[in-house]
Design a protein with these regions (language model features):
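Non-catalytic, regulatory and substrate/membrane-recognition segments associated with hydrolase enzymes
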Residues: 210-211, 221
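Mature extracytoplasmic enzyme cores
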Residues: 209, 243, 354-357
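C-terminal anchoring/interaction modules
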Residues: 1-43, 114, 122, 127-135, ...
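Terpene synthase/cyclase
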Residues: 33, 46-55, 70, 328, ...
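Acidic/polar, low-complexity linker and loop regions
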Residues: 69, 73-97, 160-192
Length: 628
């Protein structure tokens, strides 16, 4: 079967599966639109003929109250003792990557999407056009809205799926430039993947459909298309590709293969060719060239030479060949799901909007009712028959009466509706919603009459935070998986040493490189393998470390309590300011330098006094010897 025919059949296959998957997912997609509308303050009242005229958006308020602008930093632990230095270097690399890719912005968007929709996804890719000047390619992370990720019907866990779809709205010109083809379509197949309630399409924007699928004992493949045109088809998505001879399968090293064939094809390869000698962390050197297998000596007539005594074929050393090492491949789909509240029977987690939707609807009704009552209330004026009042905005109005009796008949009746019960029900629903999500006034920074002291208020806030611990654990779990996937991509594709920087325990800036060859090891059987045996999680204390002002205040209290040593001692001050320097305290390096100078001068003075004492003792001993 020709490649074009196979791609056509694959295209029809995946188009059909996408249609079925999206149909099964349509109910969830409809809910997503309603959730976003409520988050942005929808005026719709379910079951009512008219919309709300006054909306107190508690959904927006309660979700924004939970936003955590910090993201957890990686923590890498070595499983083997000899890998401790590699673990520290890997941890520094992942921290560098998080800063380079501006995880703060990524996290900020995720903090809204996850509680509203129940989940979102990190999409990990390798961009060969990215990287520093001395590197080729780099890891890229994109945040995918749950409406862009279409799951396999009937399967709720991403790792258990046979396939999963990703729909991305992209510029037509950008896709044409990237893949070098002319796209036939000029409109979006799925405008809902881009977002927006109107569902309108835009000229020059198309929908790229991507499917990641598993086959052949877990091998991950990728198929991508726009309209009816195939963009990418990789049965082994993570495998490296190389040009090989169509006849003998050897790697291409020139225009003509050693077998004489001139035709080559691109195909996945499971090994990498060394271009230079490399040294493993064990000290073993892998040469770029190795001796080939012994070959028989051929006589001029084409026969092989035999040993006259034994009759065995005489062999000579083979030609030098390029050395090959195994290629590393990441595991699983390149998608990481971050869940709000885990549920066993749902692909996405539980949405906060769904939980408090009834309370929001009730508040919409009561808010509208209160406003209508107040607006319809007012004052009624009683006038005698025939008396006319001036109806204008003048401050002084004239009312003409014929006699005093008409004046006595003039009166005003104030009609003020009672909205107390409506206000009470509105507040009840607001408090019910807060209680359901585990949010208290202290957690929001509001006045809390139940907390009579600062410690009590902090305790109340901590209790509320404890109820939200599950969400934080889901966030930490997602970031830990993301850091693991980033490490796998760098281990697979970062061919050049990757520059990185970090601050050591003394607060000094250190510079170095991440070289993936350091993770290449040889096992007991003599086989080479890539060492990815590290526990990658997140550091719970990293959020505190990012809040430097609080950290400095805590250290100052410890210093005053003598935790760094006796107060007034220069060595204690040096320890304290060394710690401050490591956390980026302003001008800590200048203070530390001055303390070191004082210690050095103090030490020199002490040495001088000791030298004088020693000289005096020697003179005294000499005098005693002479007298004796």
């Amino acid at each position: 079967m020709k490649k074009d025919d196979k791609q056509t059949k694959d295209l029809e296959k995946w188009q059909g599966k996408l249609s079925s998957a999206k149909s099964a997912y349509s109910g969830t997609l409809d809910k997503m639109r309603k959730r976003e509308a409520m988050y942005y303050g929808s005026h719709e009242i379910q079951g009512a003929k008219k919309d709300a005229t006054n909306v107190r958006n508690i959904i927006y308020e309660l979700i924004e109250s939970q936003v955590d602008s910090t993201y957890p930093l990686p923590k890498v632990t070595a499983i083997h003792r000899e890998d401790e230095d590699k673990a520290r270097k890997l941890e520094s690399l992942l921290r560098n990557q998080a800063r380079r890719m501006h995880f703060t912005e990524l996290n900020d968007r995720s903090e809204r999407t996850v509680p509203v929709q129940g989940a979102d996804f990190f999409h990990v890719e390798w961009n060969p056009a990215a990287g520093y000047h001395c590197t080729l390619g780099d890891v890229e992370i994109e945040l995918r809205h749950p409406r862009q990720v279409i799951p396999q019907p009937g399967v709720y866990k991403l790792d258990d799926m046979d396939y999963v779809f990703v729909q991305i709205s992209k510029s037509k010109e950008a896709l044409e430039a990237r893949y070098g083809i002319k796209l036939d379509t000029d409109t979006e197949d799925a405008p809902d993947a881009r977002g927006g309630d109107d569902g309108s399409t835009h000229t020059g924007v198309v929908t790229q459909n991507i499917v990641y699928y598993k086959h052949d004992k877990g091998t991950v493949g990728m198929f991508s298309w726009v309209g009816s045109q195939v963009l990418e088809d990789y049965p082994d998505y993570y495998a490296r590709t190389a040009e090989v001879c169509t006849k003998c399968g050897r790697r291409r090293v020139g225009d003509v293969c050693v077998c004489g064939n001139k035709k080559f094809k691109e195909q996945p390869v499971q090994t990498l060719t060394l271009t230079q000698d490399v040294m493993l962390s064990s000290g073993e050197v892998l040469p770029a060239q190795v001796q080939g297998e012994d070959v028989p000596i051929i006589n001029p007539d084409g026969s092989v030479q035999l040993d006259n005594d034994t009759g065995e074929v005489i062999l000579m050393p083979g030609e030098m060949q390029a050395n090959e090492i195994p290629a590393y491949k990441p595991h699983g789909f390149p998608l990481i799901e971050r869940v709000n509240i885990a549920a066993s029977d749902m692909f996405l987690g539980v949405s906060d909007v769904d939980i408090v939707a009834d309370q929001q609807q009730a508040i919409n009704k009561y808010g509208t009712k209160i406003q209508e009552k107040l607006l319809k209330g007012g004052s009624w004026v009683i006038l005698p028959e025939g008396v006319q009042a001036e109806l204008n905005d003048d401050e002084l109005k004239i009312l003409r009466v014929e006699n005093p009796s008409q004046r006595s008949m003039i009166d005003v009746i104030n009609v003020q509706p009672n909205v107390q019960n409506d206000q009470n029900m509105l507040e009840y629903n607001y408090n019910w919603a807060k209680s359901t999500l585990g949010i208290t006034d202290a957690f929001q920074g509001k006045y809390d009459s139940s907390a009579t002291s600062g410690s009590a208020k902090q305790f109340s806030a901590n209790q509320s935070a404890g109820r939200l611990q599950s969400k934080r654990e889901m966030k930490n779990n997602a970031y830990a998986k993301l850091y693991r996937k980033m490490f796998e991509f760098l281990l697979a594709y970062a061919d050049e040493p990757y520059p990185m920087t970090d601050t050591d325990v003394d607060g000094e800036q250190q510079y170095g490189h991440f070289d993936r060859v350091e993770f290449l090891k040889r096992d007991a059987a003599g086989e080479l393998y890539w060492n990815d045996e590290f526990i990658i999680e997140v550091d719970p204390a990293s959020n505190l470390a990012s809040n430097r002002e609080r950290l400095w205040d805590m250290a100052k209290v410890d210093f005053q309590a003598g935790a760094f040593g006796p107060i007034g001692d220069l060595n204690s001050a040096r320890t304290y300011w060394t710690w401050n320097k490591s956390t980026g305290y302003p001008y800590a390096a200048t203070v530390l330098e001055d303390i070191n100078k004082q210690l050095e001068a103090q030490q020199q003075m002490t040495q001088g006094v000791n030298a004088v004492d020693l000289e005096g003792n020697q003179t005294g001993d000499l005098t005693e010897n002479v007298q004796f």
